[in-house]
């Protein structure tokens, strides 16, 4: 006869889940959606009830949640997360793809985590101008887990942390794949895209106006000999 009394509900079972927010950031083509899918499937194998939400205006892959390499998963399309709140309350794990496009991403994730849900968000951290994308970075201090993935630079094959737009559109929200964007490293980000005119009309990827030689001159201000001259005397 066993002397061990096990509880009816084990601590790790779905009915005893503790809310949390997991954030997966990175540029395009860094594997954010693939990682989101992997994490959700991991919970599905453990018999957790899961829901994936995708941005409704992204119609490239029909109504399914899809990675760039065409792996798919059933998803619920939405433009505002509050519109699918009732469906989200009925599951244990919520996956959100393209989180940067949802204006209510912060409030929704915090409310769901406080309700005991595990919320996994995949999102771009920056725009093609390397500025914060929507409200997504406001989710970072609320999250239990945050990772930033890198891609491979599509121009020089080094590590890529940024997204570079190939076209001339000015608006932030332009949905597309490799036909409109490249993942790039720091050096390639500032290179003029092929087909774009040089000069003041091509400012998207330019840090400061001026000639290329001026950047080199600026670096010389911080040459080792100058730094030594500014050091306090012993």
Curated annotation (Swiss-Prot):
User: What is the enzyme's class at the highest EC level?
Assistant: transferase
Q: How is it modified after translation?
A: Phosphorylated on Ser-13 in mitosis. Phosphorylation of Ser-13 by CDK1 during mitosis reduces homotetramerization and catalytic efficiency when DNA replication is complete and intracellular TK1 is still present at a high level. Polyubiquitinated. Postmitosis, ubiquitination leads to proteasomal degradation. The KEN box sequence located at the C-terminal region targets for degradation by the anaphase promoting complex (APC/C) activated and rate-limited by FZR1.
Specify the protein name: Thymidine kinase, cytosolic
Q: Give the sites modified to N-acetylserine.
A: 2
Q: Which organism is it from?
A: Homo sapiens (Human)
Which keywords does this Swiss-Prot/TrEMBL entry list? Acetylation, ATP-binding, Cytoplasm, DNA synthesis, Kinase, Metal-binding, Nucleotide-binding, Phosphoprotein, Transferase, Ubl conjugation, Zinc
What is the role of the protein in this entry?
Cell-cycle-regulated enzyme of importance in nucleotide metabolism. Catalyzes the first enzymatic step in the salvage pathway converting thymidine into thymidine monophosphate. Transcriptional regulation limits expression to the S phase of the cell cycle and transient expression coincides with the oscillation in the intracellular dTTP concentration. Also important for the activation of anticancer and antiviral nucleoside analog prodrugs such as 1-b-d-arabinofuranosylcytosine (AraC) and 3c-azido-3c-deoxythymidine (AZT).
The effect of residue 194 to P is: No effect on phosphorylation
- Spell out the note in the miscellaneous section: Two forms have been identified in animal cells, one in cytosol and one in mitochondria. Activity of the cytosolic enzyme is high in proliferating cells and peaks during the S-phase of the cell cycle; it is very low in resting cells.
Which gene is the coding source of this polypeptide chain?
A: TK1
Q: What is its EC number?
A: 2.7.1.21
Gene Ontology BP term (one): protein homotetramerization
């Amino acid at each position: 006869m066993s002397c061990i009394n096990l509880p009816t509900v084990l601590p790790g079972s779905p009915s005893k889940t503790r809310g949390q927010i997991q954030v997966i950031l990175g540029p395009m083509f860094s594997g954010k959606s693939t990682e989101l899918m992997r994490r959700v499937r991991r919970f599905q194998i453990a018999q957790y009830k899961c829901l994936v939400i995708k941005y409704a205006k992204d119609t490239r892959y029909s109504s399914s949640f899809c990675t760039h390499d065409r792996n798919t998963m059933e998803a619920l399309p939405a433009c505002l997360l509050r519109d699918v709140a009732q469906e989200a309350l009925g599951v244990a794990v919520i996956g959100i793809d393209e989180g940067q496009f949802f204006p209510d991403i912060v409030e929704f994730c915090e409310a769901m985590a406080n309700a005991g849900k595990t919320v996994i968000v995949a999102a771009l951290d920056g725009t093609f101008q390397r500025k914060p994308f929507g409200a997504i970075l406001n989710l970072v201090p609320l999250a239990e887990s945050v990772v930033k993935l890198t891609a491979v630079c599509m121009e020089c094959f080094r590590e890529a942390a940024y997204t570079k737009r190939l076209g001339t559109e000015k608006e932030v929200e332009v949905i597309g794949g490799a036909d409109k964007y490249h993942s790039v490293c720091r050096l390639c980000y500032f290179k003029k895209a092929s087909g774009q005119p040089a000069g003041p009309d091509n400012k998207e990827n330019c840090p400061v106006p001026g000639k290329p030689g001026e950047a080199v001159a600026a670096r010389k201000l911080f040459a080792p000999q100058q730094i030594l001259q500014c050091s306090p005397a012993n």
